[in-house]
Amino acid sequence: MTDRLERKLAIAANQDKADLLIKNGQIVDVFQLETFEGDVVIADGEIVAISDPGTYEAHEEVDAKGAFIAPAFIDGHVHIESSMVAPEQFAKVVVPHGVTTVIADPHEIANVAGVQGVEYMLDASEGIPLDVKMMVPSCVPATPFEHSGARLTAEEVAELFRDPRIFGLGEVMDYPAVLTRDQEMMAKLKAAHSEGRIVDGHGAGLDSVALNAYTAAGIGNDHEAVTPEEAKARLQRGMYLLIREGTAAKDFDALMKAITPMNSRRALFVTDDKHLDELVEEGSIDHHVRKAIQIGVNPLQAIQMASLNAAECFKLAKKGAIAPGFTADLLFIEDLQSLAITHVFKNGTCVAKNGKLIVPIRETVQPPQRLLESVNMKLVTKEQLELSLQSDEEAHLIQIQPGSIVTKHIREKVAVKDGVFIPSVARDQLKLVVAERHHKRGTVGVGIVKGFGLTKGAIATTVAHDSHNIVAVGTNDEDLLAAIKELENIQGGMTIVKDGKVLVSLPLTIGGLMSDQSYDVVCEQIKSVDAAIGALGFVGDFNPFLTLSFLALPVIPEIKLTDQGLFDVTSFSFIDQQVYAEETN
């Protein structure tokens, strides 16, 4: 350490040659939001000096050819599992888009396999050209109102904190447990605070009083604000605002209305859950930066939000800027307005050029057998899919909202025959099913959903946040049963069924969440799924599978379905499908 420090100081003092010198660039100063011509001097993967051109010498020189030299981007909150590829493949996709650090919460795979799932993600994230700051999930399961594949106790959380690869405590979704001072939750928070770890937020729908208590618990950031008012409420309380733009949840447009040059230093960008095809086609955090620039945000401010702000939020003192003492994670950007990224450097090494990774990645870590055999369920029968209702009363329905993971709780009259709900294509009232798939419990929840617009068939997936049971939506029971059976046969993934026949399936053999294939193979499989969904009459401008995957998450308002039944998030309790007379008064 001393020798390394002395060498760094000798180079910084211009008494020794550096490892690398980047010349002919315009350095992006994210501290003062300006640019200047200068050289970047690098030793041992760290920036040791910025200088006027020609001041320093190095063993190797790289000519930036007039490009802007900016700090690399940080994704402040992501579930790698939602990309549907393993961490090694995920890195191949996001690094060429300028992202060299992610704050990852593996609670998807933890809900399937507990500590074993977290440890797999830690192992799979080592030795790749992407810094993965792994959080330990705080809410596995998210609530006691669903059956997950595993639990993470306070004792297990505390034990995981002993692993130096664990960065902090993942998003606290069970906010009622915080407000009621549930002792299990208190133990997890205390363990994080005693270790000096970051605690991530998930304060969906919190009012001002609840938000006060939530912040007082030491939760310093939140990605669940969905309106300008909610954004300001978090900023007023000193929280960092994480501006989310993923595949299902698209909050960027609403939240940026609350951002000004005066408060932008407390805002940063996150993807949360983003499918592989969108990561490939439009990008990761670079997509946020482009969108910000397109709506008139100063490009330097947008870059600052994606780098320095994120680094400061997560106390990453050596990341987020082009300055002495900072890690040499940087980008060459030809044009700021279009954010044309040509080169990505990680620890002073060029790892990507023109949208492609140019360094090899080690062989993929083999997942434990438990993750490869994660669909263990009892046979689902047609009788279990029956939903008893009275024909002369309204029913509680889940109304999806494209571009959001928040649903609306609505009441409508539905088609009923012989006391059983009949899906109606004309009314867009389809059957929603959540079937437990981890421990052969045989529990099945059945509800009614509006907004998918399917006219025939069924779709199903084992990606069902956060307990990741099987969730399916369809126009008839036969296709629903066939879709559920197909997922059991392929040990997890996505499937589309019509007239009892499987049109296409996308196997996700790692925990029913991620593929063991390369990202380009998975991209082609996704294209096949996208092409086949039209056969069911789907014409929506949203991703039906990702939207479906959030309909079983009982910590996101307003109403959801778990394997145990219909759940009213507002009252935080189960409700009957039927609307009774006393409810209408």
Swiss-Prot record:
Its cofactor is Mn(2+). This is Adenine deaminase. The keyword Methyltransferase does not apply. Keywords: Hydrolase, Manganese. Its EC number is 3.5.4.2. One of its GO terms (biological process) is adenine catabolic process. GO terms for molecular function: adenine deaminase activity. Belongs to the metallo-dependent hydrolases superfamily. Adenine deaminase family. InterPro entries: Adenine_deam (IPR006679), Adenine_deam_C (IPR026912), Amidohydro-rel (IPR006680), Metal-dep_hydrolase_composite (IPR011059), Metal_Hydrolase (IPR032466). HAMAP family: Adenine_deamin. SUPFAM superfamilies: Composite domain of metallo-dependent hydrolases, Metallo-dependent hydrolases. It comes from the Bacteria. Gene3D superfamilies: Metal-dependent hydrolases (3.20.20.140), Urease, subunit C, domain 1 (2.30.40.10). It comes from Halalkalibacterium halodurans (strain ATCC BAA-125 / DSM 18197 / FERM 7344 / JCM 9153 / C-125). Pfam families: Adenine_deam_C (PF13382), Amidohydro_1 (PF01979). PANTHER family: ADENINE DEAMINASE (PTHR11113:SF2), N-ACETYLGLUCOSAMINE-6-PHOSPHATE DEACETYLASE (PTHR11113). It catalyses: adenine + H2O + H(+) = hypoxanthine + NH4(+).
